[in-house]
């Protein structure tokens, strides 16, 4: 008898959760849309920050220099960052 009552209570809770989920589905689309818009804004801010950073050679060259050194080391060459372009010089 007790198990039957617990089962009914559980079924009732599941039904209420299902109804609530269906009712909130429309609102969920709005929330997901807002989240997507915020993520797009964050992506654009990060991209703008990176572009600003790389436009200043004194800040960007160390980052590019390290990439260039690693890239050229794989080719058994010496990497040199020149005007934001990686040049592999034969050693």
From Swiss-Prot:
The keyword Nucleotide-binding does not apply. Expressed by the venom gland. The full peptide presents antibacterial and cytotoxic activities. The synthetic C-terminus (AA 33-76) inhibits voltage-gated potassium channels Kv1.1/KCNA1, Kv1.2/KCNA2, and Kv1.3/KCNA3. InterPro entries: Long_scorpion_toxin_alpha/beta. Disulfide bonds join 61-81, 68-86, 72-88. Its main location: secreted. The keyword Methyltransferase does not apply. Keywords: Antibiotic, Antimicrobial, Disulfide bond, Ion channel impairing toxin, Neurotoxin, Potassium channel impairing toxin, Secreted, Signal, Toxin. It is found in: Secreted. This is Potassium channel toxin TdiKIK.
């Amino acid at each position: 008898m007790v198990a039957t009552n617990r089962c009914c209570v559980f079924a009732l809770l599941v039904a209420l959760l299902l109804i609530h989920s269906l009712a909130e589905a429309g609102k969920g689309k709005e929330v997901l849309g807002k989240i997507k818009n915020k993520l797009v804004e964050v992506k654009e801010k990060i991209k703008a920050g990176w572009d600003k950073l790389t436009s200043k050679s004194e800040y960007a060259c160390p980052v590019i220099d390290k990439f260039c050194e690693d890239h050229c080391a794989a080719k058994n060459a010496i990497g040199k960052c020149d005007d934001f372009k990686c040049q592999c010089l034969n050693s």
